[in-house]
Amino acid sequence: GVNVLDQRGKTEYDNPFGRFDMNTFTSFAAQPYDEYAVSSTSVFAELQANEQLTSRLELGHSEDKGSSYDKLFSGRDDFDTYRDSAAWLNTLAINTQHTVLAGVDYTKDKLHSTEDFEKDSRWNQAVFIQHSYKGEVFGTELGLRHDKNQQFGSENTWNAALSLPVGQSNEFVLSYAEGFRAPTFNDLYYPMYGNPNLKAEKSKSYELQLRSQLADTVRLETSIYQTKIRDQIQYQANNDLRNVEARINGFEASLQHEVFAAQGALNLSLVDSRDRKTGHQLPRIAKRTLSYDLDKQFGAFGVGGTWRLASKSFNDAKNNQQIAGFGTMDVRGSWQATQDLGVDLRLANIFDKGYTRAMYSYDGESYGYREDRFTVLLGMTWTPNL
């Protein structure tokens, strides 16, 4: 199979600070805009060796190109990233209860920019294996992944899960997972922003889920979780990136149901995210979010909507800049014109609400980066039967 994606666009924005000249240390009036191009291509081949063994090989290449311009200035800044990837995944069904997943993956990132970076390429190699067991009384998962990063060395991460059915309609799932994330090139080296002394993030997560089939058309899923992050990469203030110790406690609930032949989903999330040293709330994470989705199909046509609420949050690590909560409403429609062609229409933020999810400071005052107001999005999906 083949997957191809290409997306291009242009963005204009306001810059109250003006264009800063590093040679003269003077700011000039500016009318900046960006042009971007995001593309990816991947090919895969899958082999059913026998009834028990399936093997899949995938190769990919992706590009994220961005150029910054100024209508009042002739120069430009380029920031282009490239990634080559390869993955080999093997699935062995030993019997109806035991399954083993094993594989390797490789990525190589490259950076081309008008800015000077200390490093402009690195690779990551990984090997992983996971065993799954599904029995009548319980089920288990146990996995191990070994990463070798050219810049940040080697790291082992584990994951495990235990599922316990209770009666015919309920199931408890207890899980544990470890994470590893290397800083990006921007985090490390971007001029006047990056911190070359950053460490890689490491995390441990614990979660307890309850899945209940309350009725034929009503399903409830709830979970409580805790994530502890060592050396989380966090923006502090004044272009300062640091590693901090963080802790996130959360509760999530999802009620999926059918009403008048329409599919509905009510989702609630409660999050308490803290810097473990200062006790402050982590930046730009709302404590409470609530959303409701409703979709109905009429033959080849579909309609739906999403209502979303988010509570206040803080923009900075010291919790001095408060971001107000907000609510939005989206509606959507779809039409499967032919077996191969589908058309989608989305009206986002139909009540044209003004809101922000991040802020900046200028002349001692705080201002919000404005999110999109009323937006119309039209898309087409072509899926040829080759």
What annotation goes with each model-predicted range?
Residues 248-249, 354-386:
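C-terminal beta-signal and terminal closure region of outer-membrane beta-barrel proteins
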Residues 39-43, 84-88, 125-129, 140, ...:
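Hydrophobic, lipid-facing positions within transmembrane beta-strands of outer-membrane proteins
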Residues 96-100, 134-139, 220, 224-228, ...:
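Gram-negative outer-membrane beta-barrel transporters
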Residues 2-6, 57-61, 86, 102-108, ...:
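Transmembrane beta-barrel strands of outer-membrane/channel proteins
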Residues 26-40, 48, 82, 150-151, ...:
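Outer-membrane beta-barrel signature, preferentially recognizing the C-terminal barrel domain
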Residues 1-85, 115-117:
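Flexible loop and strand-edge segments within Gram-negative outer membrane beta-barrel domains
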Residues 53-63, 67-69, 99-107, 114, ...:
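Surface-exposed extracellular loop regions of Gram-negative outer-membrane beta-barrel proteins
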Residues 45-51, 92-94, 131-135, 146, ...:
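Residue-level signature of outer-membrane beta-barrel architecture
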